[in-house]
Every structure is written in structure tokens, then in C-alpha cells.
Amino acid sequence: MFYTETYDVIVIGGGHAGTEAALAPARMGLKTLLLTHNVDTLGQMSCNPAIGGIGKGHLVKEVDAMGGLMAHAADKAGIQFRTLNSSKGPAVRATRAQADRVLYRQAVRTALENQPNLDIFQQEATDILIEQDRVTGVSTKMGLIFRAKSVVLTAGTFLAGKIHIGLENYEGGRAGDPASVNLSYRLRDLGLRVDRLKTGTPPRIDARTINFDILAKQHGDAVLPVFSFMGSVSDHPQQIPCYITHTNEQTHEVIRNNLDRSPMYTGVIEGIGPRYCPSIEDKVMRFADRNSHQIYLEPEGLTSNEVYPNGISTSLPFDVQMGIVNSMKGLEKARIIKPGYAIEYDYFDPRDLKPTLETKAISGLFFAGQINGTTGYEEAAAQGLLAGINAGLYVQEKEAWYPRRDQSYTGVLVDDLCTLGTKEPYRVFTSRAEYRLLLREDNADIRLTPIAHELGLIDEARWARFNQKMEKIEQERQRLRSIWLHPRSEYLEEANKVLGSPLVREASGEDLLRRPEMTYDILTSLTPYKPAIEDREAVEQVEIAIKYQGYIEHQQEEIEKQKRHENTAIPANFDYSKVSGLSNEVRAKLEQHRPVSIGQASRISGITPAAISIILVNLKKQGMLKRGE
């Protein structure tokens, strides 16, 4: 049975990738359908109740800069905000919010239900319809067929998901939700490379059974950060603390004595887990010299008694989980509400994707989120946004868009996945970016909002506010560079009181601000440089741009050198077998990866600079290089 309407874009899955993937084409004016097995779990935080962190906060800001939802929802739901690495340089500072699960889900659902051009339908997708290697629609469990010009698949951990608690296991997409088995079989039939990954979650503890009085408190920042460029502190709900406890030798003994009942250590689980979020049994065995691990007790919400013990993800049997929990300080009498578990699921090799996240094999079919081998809400949201944008551009027969590595962390993420692939759940870190001084949280809107405006992703109110901010930044910089202080100035004594060394030659406001002891607030407290502007976002940009000008210019010069051939396109039908001078190994890798550009080809393991030169020569011979390349 066919549904009466035809859609431009269908998105399968209502998690963090799916919600962004559905909103993007709808904002672009395209008729979009979001298919989910349960509308009540839209935007569900399946694991830890937190958004952001090192690298991850950067992704949230980038999604927000392009009109995405995650930052807005985090502001509405955040019950503890912190700026991580606040004492370090601006490149690695990151925002993190502890979130109320219910408020977060409400914010997501409200945004989806009020988005023009977006329909939501509750039904499990069981098949993707394809004709002549081109997607044509989706069929569901009840036999209803939806026709569409493009499809974005964001199935999370649901594809052939299997939940493990001890040596018992059963099919499931997450606790309480069914796995998507039929769709997994269908995707395997398409000839895409598939493998298994694993992730896990800790048991949830009843707050009423925890002795918080003997535990250390962790409060949020006194000056609360805001995630969205359009948000404000007034969006935040009540702020509450987290608490800290530790594992101990008794905890570790309980774990070591029960490894024969662990699905990971008995070979029942074959999928590889996330390196940077290991289970407690992994931590105890891998770091045997440590007699304690820090555990954060994170509240799941303002109206919930559930507590998330961050740091004890486990798939050990329930009785062992009780032993682990009750062995820790403050948790001696704690009761588990939900057991921890591990989940294995299918993921598809992201090297079979274009950088737009469209599959190379099927036109109009896009993948985003954990199906591509990533871990984390933020990584999923960034991919969902990108896939949704390109699904919309595909429908309109417009040129695809994807960010470069020097343009955003989303660009780093996608390039890493599509070029190198992954054998373990991939997460973003600031260390993965070569040009991280340019990819800061604070300038995500400067980097990406103009592009979002061109693509039709943001409204005019947001665009006007962005332009006002840019005008303030430029006006203030011009003001500071036009006001000079010289050794004979009547204000010299006032300035020398705050300068590390006396002023001996004429200096502009920008020159003074470059001094390590000087800040914008100190500078604008001096009589010649009063008054300060009130917009703190603009102040931050002015200060960073001036203080780090030399470093920023150096990185931009490096980028320009690199870009000479970075974006040189390699045609999809380029025949490497006819390129003489390439080794068989290099030729095989290029045939396997089918890189879309010289830059992508250069990052494939084993592809030498000499091989790149040979390819460039052949592209030039065949007239495939543009003038100047």
C-alpha cells in the first residue's frame, strides 16, 4: 500500500542524527518525513545524560551555527554547565552540559513538531526501495510504502542489535526497544561492507539510596556558559551538583573474580568497544596498577531519582553489578533501578560513503551516526546535519556541500571516516584537527553561519543578529587600532600601572592588547580606551583575534599551501589501471577507496607523495585539471 504523498527526503530514525537530518531539509523548504519506531523517544539520550565536552562541544557549536537543534535543546535542558579547559588556550576550551533527559527530549520533540515542511510518522522501516541503483522510497513493518527522492538512514545501535547482560543476550536496539533486524538484512544485500561494534552503559542507581553527605560535590561554573549562539542563561533550568565517588580494591576484586561471567572476556561479544569510554572491567584489567578509578554520580533530571554513575559501564551479570555498586563509598546501600548492559550492532564501512555521506553504491541514500562507526550524540548530530543538507541538495539537483578539515571539526570527522575508515567507535578530539586554533568553539558561527545562510538553513532574524555581531567586532577593532598612546601622553602613568613594563614607544590599543598581561577588560578600563562594548561574544572575538593574530595568520598560510591540490577533484570513473608508475599496492588502495579529491587520496595509508604527483600528471594529461592547479 502506497502512502498518498511523495516526499523529497525521508529520514529513518529519531535519535540525535535523525532529528538533525530531518530538520535540515525541512528548513530548506523541502517536504520531509521522519520515520521513527516510537515518537515518545525522539531525541532520547540513550546513554549518559550530557552534551558536549572536549571536541564534542565544538561539534555542538558547529551544528548550532548551521541552524541545528542540539545546542538549543542543551540550553533548555542543561542542569549543570561547565567550561572545560578554561585555563588553557581558546582552541581547546569546551562547553559541557549535564542534561535533564525529560527536558531534553521535550525540547527536541517541540522543535520537530513545530517545524514547517516536516511530518513525523511512527512505524518501523523494514526495507529501502531501490530501482537501478537509485533510492525510491521506504517500506514499513505494516506494509505501508513511502515514496521519496532521497533517504537518510540514522539507525543508531538498532541494526541487528544484541543486548548482553552477563552470559545472557537478546535482540534489542537499546533497553526496552526492539532491534531492526529486517533492515539490517536488507542493507547487507546491497553489498556494502559491514562489521560489528559494541558499546555499553552503566546501571542506573536510585538517588534515594545514596549517601550523598559523605561524597564530594561538583558544582557547575559560577558564570554559566551558553551553548547556542541564539541562547541565553535565562534558557537554563535549575542548576544542581554532581557527586564524586571512587572504585577501590574491593570493587576490583569483585570484577576480577567474575570475569568468567563477562561476555567480553569469554568471547561472547565480538564487536570492538569505544577506546575512550571503556567498561569498568576493561579499566580494571588494562590498568592493573591503579587501585582506584573516579566515578561521577550524575543526576538524570530535576524530577527523576535515577543517577547515572559515569565510569562503571558494564555487561557483567546483575548480581556482580550490585557487588560493584555497593563496594563504593556512599553507595553501600544503593539500589539499582536499571541494570547496565553492552550492545552489539551492525555498522557499515564509512569508506563506502562520499564525503557528503551519500553511499557510493546507491544514489540518494545517505548514512549518518553510529551506522558509520562513530560514538557519541554530538558526532551523530553533526553527521545528521550534513547528511540532511546533502539529501536536500541532491533532491534539488544542486551541487553537494561538505566542510573541509580546515573549516570545521565536522570536516575532520567526515574526512577521517570516509578516507581512513574505522575499526572501533570513532569519537572527535581537538587533537585530531591540524588547524585547531582556527576551529574554536567561539568562532563556529563565523566559520559556518554564512554558508548556512546560503544553503537556506537559518532564518533572517539569526542572520541579522550574526551580521550585527560581525559589525561590532570590526568597529571595535578599528577603534582600538586608531587610538594611540605615546610616552608623552597624559594617560601614560595610568597605563604603566597595569603594564608589565613601562611604555617606551607609541602603541595602539591593539598593540597594548597583544601584551600577555593585558586583557580587553583591563585595556578598556583605561581612560583613552573607554568604553568597553557590552557584547561579550564580540569582546571574545576581538581579544582572540588580536592576541593570537600571528599564530592565526601562520595557520592560514599553511592552509593556503595545502589547499593548492586539496580540492582537486578526481573523477569517479578515473581509471587507475591506466596510470603507469603506480605500484600494485597503491593502485589497489586507490581502487578500493575511490577518493574524490587529491587531498583525500593523500591521506590514505600507504599513498606516497610520489604517487600523488603521478596522479596529478595524469589528470593534467587528460585535461582534468583546472587552470592553476
Swiss-Prot record:
PANTHER family from the UniProt entry: GLUCOSE INHIBITED DIVISION PROTEIN A, PROTEIN MTO1 HOMOLOG, MITOCHONDRIAL
Protein name: tRNA uridine 5-carboxymethylaminomethyl modification enzyme MnmG
Pfam families: GIDA, GIDA_C_1st, SAM_GIDA_C
Gene that produces this protein: mnmG
Entry annotated with the keyword Protein transport: no
Assembly and oligomerization: Homodimer. Heterotetramer of two MnmE and two MnmG subunits.
PROSITE patterns per UniProt: GIDA_1, GIDA_2
Names of the cofactor(s): FAD
Xref: InterPro entries: FAD/NAD-bd_sf, GIDA_C_N, MnmG, MnmG-rel, MnmG-rel_CS, MnmG_C, MnmG_C_subdom, MnmG_C_subdom_sf
Top-level taxon: Bacteria
